[in-house]
Amino acid sequence: LPISFYLNLIVSGGFVEENINDENNFRNLIWERIICLKDKCKKYGVLQSDVRKTVERIVFERASRFVVGVDSDIVDSDILEALKSEGIIVESRNKIRLKYDIFEDICFERYIDKAFDACHGSYNVFFDEIEKIGRCIYRRYQIWISNKLFVQEAREKFVYTLLTDNSIEAKWKKQTEIGIVKSKYCGLFFKEFQELLDETVVEELLDITNLYAFEAKINHSPALIMNVTPIGAARENLIGMVFEERISLDKNRTSIIKLCDDYANCFYKTADTEEKAYKIIIRYIDELIEKSKEEKSYYQHDEEIVQLFLIVAKMAKSSKSWLKEFVENMIVEYCSGTSRRDSVAEEILKAVVKKCPLLFAMELPELACKSAETLWGQRVSRKHFRYDGYDHNNVRAYGLSDNANHFDNNENGVYNNTFFWYVMRCDFV
């Protein structure tokens, strides 16, 4: 299990010898044994059914009213003492709530499960029922959908139907899509249904992934920063479908580029998907270079070519051979004296030096240094004219170029420049 919180509960809750089949099964055990005090009710002289009703009341009232906690007076004193003693709720200034968000999520899952079973396939009745709680139900519904992808029966009878049934309200269809793409288990869904998903549905899932398949984490070191991290397995599956041209690469160009860029930022990547992602981006790079040659000018496209190059550079493990050949060609073009109008070489070399991604520097350190040397050294073919002005800093005397003289390294020095940092950190010199 990847969640340390679960591991702690397995040990502290006495689940070490339990036959836990999957996360859903374990969450059911958490609900019965920990949250509802199944084995400890007798100790406090309370009924488990009363504990369950109390927990549900605390959770639903707090969520529907969007408050930090609910009044402790609404809870029976014996049940309140039991829940506090077992670490299920916390109290502050006579306000109580469940101690962990995950406890509340499990409570909502149980509620949604019951409403779903009671609807007997009338999904709009199901949605009307759970919507009575208020807007707070949307996020919990997404979590419920994410976990339902475990169960094959649920995928066949429910999730696929929600995506294709036109009688389902648009807002619930959207919430279903969000739940799918945020799930780490949605690969099971794509594997079974990708042949049945038409281009429109795939495009919708692509856009939803780009908008919602992230989680925010607060980082307190060295300053307070919120990091937004891509999550879920949707990108991996969608990239495979894009690579097979299940949707138009031209029509969905912006969305596909973002999809691949976000995948490049994922902590866990597979070699196969990474290779597909960078090859998709290379196709766009080649198209822009050809377009620039036809227009006889790179000015209109150089910024976009550089951005696409940096996406590929983030996936340097898979794209190493292409990056080496591409940057070497840029170095040759730059040294040949080709003007900036006729080549994007200078912009690519500047990107390597000023925005060098970690993996590029780690996989191709010599090429990174060679790019800097080429950019900062004088070109043999470069002629100096009177209007170039006096060489105040003697850069030309030292064999350096204007790029070296005007290189913006601001007040933070090596700590604000990735290339310098990697050179210093990794002993490239």
Question: Which residues does each predicted region cover?
Answer:
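Intrinsic-disorder/low-complexity, polar/charged segments
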Residues: 3-5, 19-25, 118, 182, ...
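Winged-helix-like regulatory helical subdomains adjacent to P-loop NTPase cores
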Residues: 13-77, 92-97, 101, 114
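Residues that cap or delimit alpha-helices
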Residues: 1-2, 23, 76, 169, ...
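The conserved phosphate-sensing helix
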Residues: 1-12
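A short, conserved structural fragment
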Residues: 84-94
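Extended amphipathic alpha-helical scaffold segments
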Residues: 67, 92, 113-429
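Type-3 copper protein
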Residues: 80-81
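Basic, glycine-/proline-tolerant helical and adjacent loop/strand elements
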Residues: 100, 105, 109
